[in-house]
């Protein structure tokens, strides 16, 4: 895994190219990423960098976490995230340092992970895009039913994984191979082409794309 940044989804807007084309973009604030710990093979069994983002009141921080952050000399954040990196990259970082938008560049392909917007309990039409039944012509009280969910006495059960009604959204999702359309280094903003998971103000994780095409 590559080194990335933790950010906050600000919202969506659009920008224009020199040719006048409109590009929908999502604004992601990625400032104030602070390194809290460097993990190594010798001490932890693997190599990674631990990062915190945002701020949190001291009264909301547990004593073990407060001691952990004090050792690195950083302020408590809302999120703590680890990025698996190689030993060479870990040697360039140190606890207490900051990460900024210069990790990325315009045109780079990235993956963005976030928690999708919760929709509550949903039917199969909204949740799985099932077709609805006929409105008339002999159909009564079966307009939005999912249909058959299995056989009869044999096997006598509904197979696991059957697409049915249930809770929709509020799940961790990753959108891959998005493109960085613009970077505002002064305000520490990434403008990502297209939509990303989550609601406004939601926390997201931005990393270089793992399936980027050369």
Curated annotation (Swiss-Prot):
One Gene Ontology molecular-function label: rRNA binding
InterPro entries xrefs: Ribosomal_uL3, Ribosomal_uL3_bac/org-type, Ribosomal_uL3_CS, Transl_B-barrel_sf
Gene3D superfamilies for this protein: 3.30.160.810, Translation factors
Stretches the record annotates as Disordered: 133-153
Entry keyword annotation includes rRNA-binding: yes
Keywords, comma-separated and alphabetical: Methylation, Ribonucleoprotein, Ribosomal protein, RNA-binding, rRNA-binding
Subunit description: Part of the 50S ribosomal subunit. Forms a cluster with proteins L14 and L19.
Protein name: Large ribosomal subunit protein uL3
Biological source species: Cupriavidus metallidurans (strain ATCC 43123 / DSM 2839 / NBRC 102507 / CH34)
Gene name of the encoded protein: rplC
